[in-house]
């Protein structure tokens, strides 16, 4: 019961039906760009005479267009990737596979980042020593985005023995491991961009994002064919 609270603090937007009269709210409302799906929320805030403090509007010097001071950053990616490893280990265990990721606790259980890094690097030593069976490998972590969240998630990923490969190399990875041209005792990372997600209808590559954004009907999706079938874990770092 938050009826006695004068300030209600959240992270993501609060459902419109939860907004109370004459309250102060602090959260990401996703309304500053006039996102149509969230206009009912803004209308409700006005109707109920509530006051909204939006993290997105907290900027350097309090000026429009100045750098934001509150945003999802590197540590969101770090914590998310640690929990990703832990959840992945539990998923493999549920599928009947003993695996080194089971030895990674969730992010909140570490005293500090150094402890998390040491734990994950020790798991990496197990991977280097034992590798993965044919049933499990290759393990491919596919990343989207290039911002702070992705940078944080990649930092944690790189605590393990790893190699980055291209989307094209994905298609031959199993064969390359089988013939010894690529190792089986690492995890693989793939960095994907908008160019990997769509192509022109004639099959030619998308090379101009602005043209794609302006003319989406001239393009077809390719990510589901070229990337997803070869991906073990999709690490989504863009909004």
At which residue positions do the language-model features occur?
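Glycine-rich phosphate/diphosphate-binding loop of Rossmann-like nucleotide-binding domains
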Residues: 96-232
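Glycine/serine-rich phosphate-binding loop and adjoining beta1-alpha1 elements at the start
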Residues: 16, 20-139
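Rossmann-fold NAD(P) dinucleotide-binding segment
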Residues: 4-33, 221-233, 239
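Glycine- and other small-residue-rich loops at beta-strand/loop junctions that grip anionic moieties
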Residues: 30, 69, 73, 142, ...
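Short secondary-structure boundary/hinge segments and terminal tails
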Residues: 4, 62-64, 175
């Amino acid at each position: 019961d938050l009826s006695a609270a004068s300030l209600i603090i959240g992270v993501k937007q609060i459902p419109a039906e939860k907004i109370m009269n004459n309250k102060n709210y602090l959260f990401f409302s996703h309304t500053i760009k006039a996102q149509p799906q969230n206009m009912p929320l803004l209308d409700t805030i006005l109707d109920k005479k509530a006051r909204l403090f939006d993290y997105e509007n907290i900027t350097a010097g309090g000026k429009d267009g100045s750098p934001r001071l509150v945003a999802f950053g590197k540590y969101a990616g770090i914590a998310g990737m640690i929990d990703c490893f832990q959840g992945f280990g539990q998923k493999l265990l549920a599928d009947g596979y003993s695996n080194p990721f089971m030895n990674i606790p969730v992010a909140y259980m570490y005293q500090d980042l150094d402890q998390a890094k040491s734990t994950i690097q020790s798991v990496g030593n197990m991977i280097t020593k034992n590798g993965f069976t044919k049933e499990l490998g290759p393990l491919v972590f596919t990343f989207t985005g290039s911002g702070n969240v992705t940078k944080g998630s990649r930092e944690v990923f790189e605590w393990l023995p790893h190699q980055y490969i291209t989307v094209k190399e994905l298609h031959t990875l199993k064969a390359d491991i089988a013939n010894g041209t690529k190792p089986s005792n690492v995890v693989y990372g793939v960095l994907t961009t908008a160019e990997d997600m769509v192509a022109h209808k004639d099959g030619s590559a998308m090379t101009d994002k602005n043209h794609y954004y302006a003319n989406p009907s001239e393009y077809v999706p390719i990510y589901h064919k070229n990337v997803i079938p070869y991906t073990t874990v999709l690490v989504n770092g863009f909004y």
